[in-house]
Regions:
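Activation-segment/catalytic-loop signature of the eukaryotic protein kinase fold
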Residues: 80
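Conserved short submotifs of the Hanks-type protein kinase catalytic core
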Residues: 84-98
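Protein kinase catalytic-loop region centered on the HRD/HxD motif
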Residues: 122-132
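Structural helix C-cap motif within protein kinase domains
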Residues: 209-213
Length: 463
């Protein structure tokens, strides 16, 4: 896929100035007959050299933004192009000043830190109230509108409590901005809104002191220090930081999520009412934890276990998760087992349709396994990681389309592994799958190793 240029037209939208070039996507201002429109288009970066996570992030962002009620704390999704044809998101253009502009002139006055932080906390509270966790909070992803409201952008790594988390289900490494990432995110936990409060604390720390609380980790080993190493108290770096602000910041940055604030609304209240902030020993802390305490934390870091994720704001009844194992084209192992792939696909579809008719709550996870990206050979977009990923997603969607299920009940996963059975079993274990539907050569081994019920499907003789 070539890089879009200003002046290009996509589905009737004309691209204007490129506003942002990120690692996963480009953002363009859109043009109308009389000049710039109050809209932007986000286009995922696909093609040679681009990782498959770009596709996953695009799908995640589309689902989350589409589910949020219209409001000032996030951009409104206007239109989108399907991943099968031309993927893009058309969103409201947010006028405002980025938090990164204030950050460039840090340290800031405590009153300014509190005002900016309180508005940001209210924005977080609003998305948390709708069961969304941002999980990629950084100064570049926060804007302040002319009216003063904080607006969160870039929901490509976000989690929605009522939608499948494609990143949690397919990615095994920490994703997000390492400078602000919470300890539980490092361990792959993406369902806790208190992770956003940790990132908020890191931003407040940087605004108040001009320094990052944990520096800029460049290796996984450096990142894991966050499981046991607390930051230097802000007042030790800048005496002008008041004790109430240090109390708020360090409470947000607690390693144990149970020791943080319970909600972003509480953070907003404390920042707006400094005189009412209850001071603990955090407020007067002048040094990091002593070497003995740090040593003990480090020794127990290997077994560090955050508290379970809190219930959703609007807790829904648990719905069973059903994994359907499919294979299309050049996957690692054939599902055929002597029968045609088309016949087996239809048999699987028929079995899933019966299940959905019996249980209207179940979620269907359609998955296929492909070789790792390093095993790709050949030229052109089809031989790239993103090209192959999209091709397999298209096949999965085509298989599922006749089921006529609501979008929130279907997910599509392209798993990379040289061992297809192990990949399917790992997916089922990590995502607490309740039942697996499988056909062909993989069926016996999957059935013997699966952590859940397995239905082995065969095509009818006439098929």
């Amino acid at each position: 896929m070539r890089t879009p240029e200003p002046g290009d037209e996509i589905d009737g939208f004309r691209l204007g100035e490129r506003l942002h070039t990120g690692t996963m996507a480009w953002i363009y201002r859109l043009l109308g007959p009389d000049g710039p429109l109050p809209l932007v288009m986000k286009i995922p970066r696909l093609g040679p050299g681009e990782p498959a996570i770009n596709v996953i992030s695009f799908e995640q962002c589309r689902m989350v933004l589409g589910a949020l009620a219209q409001g000032p704390h996030y951009p409104t999704l206007v239109a989108y192009g399907d991943i099968e044809t031309t993927p893009y998101l058309v969103m409201e253009y947010v006028e405002g000043r980025r938090l990164s502009e204030w950050m460039r002139e840090a340290p800031r006055a405590p009153e300014e830190v509190a005002a900016l932080g309180a508005k940001l906390a209210l924005a977080l509270h609003e998305i948390h109230r709708q069961d969304v966790i941002h999980l990629d909070l950084k100064s570049a992803n926060v804007l302040y509108r002319p009216g003063g409201e904080a607006t969160l952008v870039d929901f490509g790594l976000a989690h929605h409590g009522h939608f499948p988390d494609l990143l949690a289900e397919e990615v095994r490494t920490p994703v997000g901005n390492w400078e602000y990432m919470s300890p539980e995110q490092i361990l792959g936990i993406r369902c806790d809104p208190r992770s956003d409060l940790f990132a908020l604390g890191a931003l407040l720390y940087e605004l108040a002191t001009g320094r990052l609380p944990f520096g800029r980790p460049s290796t996984a080993a450096q990142l894991r220090r966050r499981l046991y190493l607390d930051p230097a108290p802000p007042r030790a770096l800048r005496a002008a930081v008041p004790d109430w602000l240090q109390e708020v910041v360090l409470r947000c940055l607690e390693i144990d999520n149970r020791s943080r604030y319970a909600s972003a609304a509480e953070v907003a209240f404390d920042l707006a009412n400094p005189a009412q902030v209850p001071r603990t020993e955090r407020a007067s802390r002048s040094t990091r934890a002593g070497w003995l305490q740090r040593f003990g934390r480090r020794m127990s870091a290997g077994s560090f276990a955050p508290a379970p994720c809190p219930p959703l704001a609007s807790q829904a009844a648990a719905a069973p998760i059903v994994l359907v194992a499919l294979a299309f084209g050049p996957t690692i192992d054939s599902v055929g087992g002597g029968q045609s792939d088309e016949a087996l696909c239809e048999a699987l579809r028929r079995s899933v349709r019966r299940l959905c008719g019996a249980d209207g709550r179940c979620r269907i996870a359609c998955a296929t396994v492909v070789p790792p990206a390093a095993a790709l050979t050949g030229e052109g977009d089809a031989a790239t990681a993103t090209g192959r990923h999209i091709r397999q997603l298209v096949e999965l969607r085509r298989w599922a389309r006749p089921l006529e299920l609501a979008e929130e009940r279907l997910t599509y996963h392209v798993l990379e592994s040289e061992k297809p059975v192990a990949a399917l079993i790992d997916y089922a274990s990590v995502n607490e799958v309740d039942q697996i539907f499988v056909a062909g050569n993989l069926a016996a081994e999957v059935a013997s190793r699966a952590p859940c019920s397995v239905t082995v499907v065969r095509a009818r003789p006439q098929e």
